[in-house]
Amino acid sequence: MEQKYLLQPGKLTIETMRQVHRRHVPITLAPDSFERIHSAEQTVRDVITQGRTVYGINTGFGLLANTKIEVDELELLQRSIVLSHAAGIGTLMSASTVRLLMLLKINSLARGYSGIRLIVIEALIALYNHQVYPAIPEKGSVGASGDLAPLAHMSAVLLGEGEVIYQGNQISAEKGLMIAGLQPISLAPKEGLALLNGTQASTAFALQGLFYAENALTSSIAIGALSVDAALGSRVPFNERIHIVRGHQAQIDVATGFRTLLQESEIGKSHGGCEKVQDPYSLRCQPQVMGACLQQMRFAKQILVTEANGVSDNPIVFSESDDVLSGGNFHAETVAMAADMLAIALAEIGALSERRMALLIDSSLSGLPPFLVDNGGVNSGFMIAQVTSAALASENKSYAHPASIDSLPTSANQEDHVSMATFAGRRLRDIFDNVAGILAIEWLAASQGIDFRFPLKTSTQLQSVHALMRSKVTFYDKDRYFSPDIEQAKLLITRHSLSDLVQQDIQLL
């Protein structure tokens, strides 16, 4: 049996979240969290017995917050909010996204500030551990008041409503509960709202985008280094002293990655005394551009790790003082802005890759055969592959427009400013998909260029990068049906084959 990860509420690391995104990691809740969970639950009970009126416990929601609910309707109130808020539409979230979302929700609830019973948290853990994933539509949240619709679809399963995905099949929530050894739950006061309020969907999407960006940047450094050799680029721009005097650590780290990958290359040594003074920016300024992207990724990581471990419920239960305080921690503006930074970084990684690929097919810049193929004219080589790359890079410019500057009032103007964090995070997948295609095309081109430099060899590390490509796609000695080769190369990127190959040479996050 696979060992379970001991979840200490509020102490999730980026490494754990990365693992959960890539595969199923069973969890168990640290017993020392139980007391705080029980204390917050008792505070909610006290509110009811004392006859106090507290938002979310015995009132309506949103614009109806001033409507008091009688005691005999409190259970119905919590059930109703879950069912009415399960209004999402569109494609269902992937299993990896739902895993992250559930982990983050469990982590937040187990902090003991939501007033929810341990039995409800344990039910979520049971679903998660049995890989019974709620069927959650991707669209329907504006990132304030939390991710209501997505989390309602998750929570409805606990009531025996909605559907789940189990072993790739979509089945009823009732069957899913049986698989996890559960019965439908009747929610106690505040529990429905506690399940729904929170930024976990937005944060899961943004974290997923961070992992995509990490993969893209690692792959881009490896492919960019291969392009340097294919184009007979200079090593001087990667000299450590250049980057140290500027002082940006991320730029220094990216330059270190390039030096590591390019060291001891026969191709590099072959033109050390050439008269060419400077390379175009797409080769020469890679540490500066990719370093800037890495800076944004590191900043986004800090924000998202904090958010993943924070409490984004409302109201918040402070059992030590018997207070239940209403605020706005559900507003995901910080997540939206982090996702916007990642969108810009991802788009720039793709934009720079497209320029490097364009350089390689231009014989006047690279010294390689035009469009990287012999018998040009009869053969068009990589001519239209570069057009595809340009189309993808241009599309990403629209995707990278900041989502956080948009807002649209909801709930009859009670919720009059929202973050759009869910879309901000979700569109990162589409940007990455385009970037992976751009990088795949450059990798094909750079590998072709390396072959044209034979018998000179690139570095040992980059020979491995070249060999990985050639294990799937052969040399272009003449024109052939091109699209399948791009898809093969793209899979090597999206499935982490390339980033896993070079990750020990390139330390990023």
From Swiss-Prot:
Keywords tagged on the record: Cytoplasm, Histidine metabolism, Lyase
Domain of life: Bacteria
Subcellular localization: Cytoplasm
Catalytic reactions on record: L-histidine = trans-urocanate + NH4(+)
Keyword Lyase: yes
GO CC terms: cytoplasm
InterPro entries cross-referenced by the UniProt entry: Aromatic_Lyase, Fumarase/histidase_N, HutH, L-Aspartase-like, Phe/His_NH3-lyase_AS
Species: Pseudoalteromonas atlantica (strain T6c / ATCC BAA-1087)
A GO BP annotation: L-histidine catabolic process to glutamate and formate
Residue numbers of 2,3-didehydroalanine (Ser) PTMs: S145
Similarity comment: Belongs to the PAL/histidase family.
Cross-link 5-imidazolinone (Ala-Gly): where in chain: A144-G146
Gene label: hutH
UniProt modification remark: Contains an active site 4-methylidene-imidazol-5-one (MIO), which is formed autocatalytically by cyclization and dehydration of residues Ala-Ser-Gly.
Signal peptide: none
Protein name per the record: Histidine ammonia-lyase
Pathway note: Amino-acid degradation; L-histidine degradation into L-glutamate; N-formimidoyl-L-glutamate from L-histidine: step 1/3
